[in-house]
A protein has these predicted regions:
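DNA replication sliding-clamp ring fold and its partner-interaction surfaces
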Residues: 1, 61-64, 68
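Short, small-residue-biased leader/transition segments that mark boundaries at the very start
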Residues: 2-6
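Flexible "stalk/tail and boundary" regions
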Residues: 7-53, 58, 67-125
Length: 125
């Protein structure tokens, strides 16, 4: 359930983080960055400054501020895409376009997983 959500803009979409995931992600990023490196501190500052706690109303809805919609180029219809433990909110016209063409996708999969021996545990199916 989405008790509190923290949206940030990332790659032309809004990403909603459940509060517990947000704090874990923020901590993970903080641990990877050098606080004495000005550029890395600016990255962290930008990441956390875009977040805002949003609590659903009695019907489970959240109202996204206009500035978030404008930042993501959302004018009317949206598409929700569940990615791991976050929810991405895209302008429908952007999300209806392929994120990668089939050749790029195939090449990326081969690059990432081509040397892996991926199999599944039949007992878990």
């Amino acid at each position: 359930s989405l008790h509190d959500a923290l949206p940030i803009l990332y790659q032309d979409c809004l990403v909603l983080y459940p509060e517990s995931v947000w704090f874990a992600t923020q901590n993970q990023l903080r641990c990877r960055l050098n606080k004495w490196n000005a550029k890395q501190q600016m990255i962290f500052r930008q990441f956390v400054s875009d977040a805002e706690v949003m609590t659903p109303d009695g019907n489970g809805r959240i109202l996204l501020p206009k500035r978030y919609l404008q930042m993501a180029g959302i004018q009317s219809d949206v598409r929700f895409i569940g990615v791991d433990n976050t929810i991405e909110i895209w302008a429908k016209e952007r999300a209806d376009q392929p994120f990668m063409n089939p050749d790029e996708f195939s090449e990326a999969l081969e690059e990432l997983l081509g040397d892996e021996n991926i199999c599944c545990d039949e007992n878990k199916l």
